[in-house]
Amino acid sequence: MATPSMMPQWSYMHIAGQDASEYLSPGLVQFARATDTYFSLGNKFRNPTVAPTHDVTTDRSQRLTLRFVPVDREDTAYSYKVRFTLAVGDNRVLDMASTYFDIRGVLDRGPSFKPYSGTAYNSLAPKTAPNPCEWKDNNKIKVRGQAPFIGTNINKDNGIQIGTDTTNQPIYADKTYQPEPQVGQTQWNSEVGAAQKVAGRVLKDTTPMLPCYGSYAKPTNEKGGQASLITNGTDQTLTSDVNLQFFALPSTPNEPKAVLYAENVSIEAPDTHLVYKPDVAQGTISSADLLTQQAAPNRPNYIGFRDNFIGLMYYNSTGNMGVLAGQASQLNAVVDLQDRNTELSYQLMLDALGDRSRYFSMWNQAVDSYDPDVRIIENHGVEDELPNYCFPLGGSAATDTYSGIKANGQTWTADDNYADRGAEIESGNIFAMEINLAANLWRSFLYSNVALYLPDSYKITPDNITLPENKNTYAYMNGRVAVPSALDTYVNIGARWSPDPMDNVNPFNHHRNAGLRYRSMLLGNGRYVPFHIQVPQKFFAIKNLLLLPGSYTYEWNFRKDVNMILQSSLGNDLRVDGASVRFDSINLYANFFPMAHNTASTLEAMLRNDTNDQSFNDYLCAANMLYPIPSNATSVPISIPSRNWAAFRGWSFTRLKTKETPSLGSGFDPYFTYSGSVPYLDGTFYLNHTFKKVSIMFDSSVSWPGNDRLLTPNEFEIKRTVDGEGYNVAQCNMTKDWFLIQMLSHYNIGYQGFYVPESYKDRMYSFFRNFQPMSRQVVNTTTYKEYQNVTLPFQHNNSGFVGYMGPTMREGQAYPANYPYPLIGQTAVPSLTQKKFLCDRTMWRIPFSSNFMSMGALTDLGQNMLYANSAHALDMTFEVDPMDEPTLLYVLFEVFDVVRIHQPHRGVIEAVYLRTPFSAGNATT
């Protein structure tokens, strides 16, 4: 018979937290059942919804919600600390789960905030169309303008006549705002008569030239005029800086035909930037060359608080932790550890409780997401069987002028029924131009959503554009452009494939992150926001606590680091880019259990008994360790000194970028120059596909797991590039063995039949939901003897119809394409199949349960060696794909993280934290 110490530790196998009846004493369970008719305690005392029907007098009635004002506050450059005194009166029980911090303040999202795509100003203008403007050439003014307004007369002092008054006196345009740019000919067939005059507005040569697309000038009068105001020298009044300029046709050189109202305006481009600028002398603001500048919209950059206000509250043990202490004993019930991940624990717990795809504004719950069509591109081409035409407004374009004639015997003569030269007739078909709308929309989607998010090494800085040296700034990220042909409509056409350079790019840092967009829009669409938010407590030991009568000190720290508490689409350094936050007030709102007083006093008496102590599990229940992976490294060894592995549940692991991982040990990390999603805290993992193998060795003598799996003991192969034995699964390069282990550890499914996990297990962070296999064919460069490695600058496809090596004006000529090689049809070239997978959001898991421990060499007692020996050292080696930046291996050692709270007397609160096998809170000790 096996000795008791070698029996499986079944009592440790509650992974997701116990039911209330499993950890409360029989007496308390009986009490809960007895009072269930008018007040339901529910699991973990979680249902304070039913008010008592008796034993509540009016003078001592219980208000559901109370507001606590801080007794002390400390506002520093990096944090805001508040302290409250919680006074819980007799016959009351304070429900800590109902408490939240009510915070008011002012947020400046900085100039990098742009909550929309495209431009708000002249978005219909061609990207290279200039504004009507003037410039000097050899000190002579040249003009490129437009005169859409038609009048009857031009006066040298008053300009264009726009009508007459009741006494038949001429009315002239008010030069401060007339002629208005939005007013012109109202009919498509309007013509300018020989006697009519024309007028328009034009920008002077002292106003900098900008493309019309995106240009804005503030109004300077209530009629909408935009001319800059200058001081009138005679009476020191402000007048509009507008001059009349008169022009004549060559045929009538001494008679004004057009008048332009030339003005200076405060021109700016609030939401666009230049992607093409000609080479002009330094300081030139207007010239003929600058007419050809090309604008592009600034990249969208949503900025809001993080999901569930991640990062706002400070959870750590280094002298800055929170406090919940009884004033009688001053023992702090909050003992946080540096290897406890409160934020991630809360995210995963919410996912287990409900549907994270539903947003809830009160707690800022809108989980980070990405558009799957952007991460994995299903390029099935475009449906463009029918051509798309555009036609002239009048249905015809250039017409010829005819006069009517009629037959006169054998000859022809003029027909008096028709006006002389009165027929306008277009010969041939209606004039039309064709545009492939479907292909242009698909190409534009690929550029805006994928190409612009390529790693910086794949982008270029446009000629004659100067960008800041700091690559974390919005100005730098916004100014860089991608080569559209690097990811055009014909790249991987017909395949479901993620562009290889994009695999290691954070897909959650994207303007299609619907959760971030929602949280940004909750705050509004302006840069400056007076906010009023409600923030719940997440720390597992006190977030569900029933606080008994007494007086308690409760204090917490709130970060003010904008990179930690705010999230942006582009992940730019918000500190450098001018964002800031100010807290004006932080109050605490709390609920008392709505119990009759005698019921509350009975509950208090029972909870004072140490047999009824409240116990809470941290949902994550793990010691989390970060191990650095240097740039381009492929192997990461880990060693854990000898210890007893009883109650150990297994490993979860993933990979993080060092740049995206803050130091939780400090309230302000000066090296954290990033504001995108933080996988370490919010669960937006995306580098799982970079693992190749992991080997696990408990001492040299222990073979674990055994050799009854497909592969060798002590080694887990995650993916195979070359699969001669056929061990891969699901049309990708993941091994059957690894797929089986993930299904077992996540869902306890070992049978690979027609069986998928139940919906309550297959949530947002689930392996099954996020596993994305894919494959494609590429040219076999070995067997295809005629293959030529034509690099990107020499590839042409759509030549003449698109810009060359940039999102610029189209150039070139129509010509047969030379790329890509055809993989289909009669002339398909020899090809190779490439396979890969992505698995975002989830963490790889290797279980270490009683069943799994049996999968090794057994002793004569039928037990694994890990049972027979009390302590073992652990060596793990992870093989990973090299990445060109430093990363971190994130390993969760799944242990039991439990707290037991005892409240023996008024104002006394004691907490005992149990952790095994990493009781010290550090896997290296």
From Swiss-Prot:
GO terms for cellular component: host cell; host cell nucleus; T=25 icosahedral viral capsid
Induction of synthesis: Expressed in the late phase of the viral replicative cycle.
Keyword flag Disulfide bond: no
A Pfam family assignment: Adeno_hexon_C
Chief location bin: virion
Record PTM N-acetylalanine, positions in chain: A2
Molecular function GO labels: structural molecule activity
Biological processes annotated in GO: microtubule-dependent intracellular transport of viral material towards nucleus; symbiont entry into host cell
Keywords per UniProt: Acetylation, Capsid protein, Cytoplasmic inwards viral transport, Host nucleus, Host-virus interaction, Late protein, Microtubular inwards viral transport, Phosphoprotein, T=25 icosahedral capsid protein, Virion, Virus entry into host cell
Site keyed Involved in interaction with pre-protein VI: positions: G750
Subcellular location: Virion; Host nucleus
Residues where Phosphotyrosine is found: Y913
Family classification: Belongs to the adenoviridae hexon protein family.
Subunit structure: Homotrimer. Interacts with the capsid vertex protein; this interaction binds the peripentonal hexons to the neighboring penton base. Interacts with the hexon-linking protein; this interaction tethers the hexons surrounding the penton to those situated in the central plate of the facet. Interacts with the hexon-interlacing protein; this interaction lashes the hexons together. Interacts with host dyneins DYNC1LI1 and DYNC1I2; this interaction might be involved in intracellular microtubule-dependent transport of incoming viral capsid.
Additional notes on this entry: All late proteins expressed from the major late promoter are produced by alternative splicing and alternative polyadenylation of the same gene giving rise to non-overlapping ORFs. A leader sequence is present in the N-terminus of all these mRNAs and is recognized by the viral shutoff protein to provide expression although conventional translation via ribosome scanning from the cap has been shut off in the host cell.
Protein task: Major capsid protein that self-associates to form 240 hexon trimers, each in the shape of a hexagon, building most of the pseudo T=25 capsid. Assembled into trimeric units with the help of the chaperone shutoff protein. Transported by pre-protein VI to the nucleus where it associates with other structural proteins to form an empty capsid. Might be involved, through its interaction with host dyneins, in the intracellular microtubule-dependent transport of incoming viral capsid to the nucleus.
The protein's name in its UniProt record: Hexon protein
Source organism: Human adenovirus F serotype 41
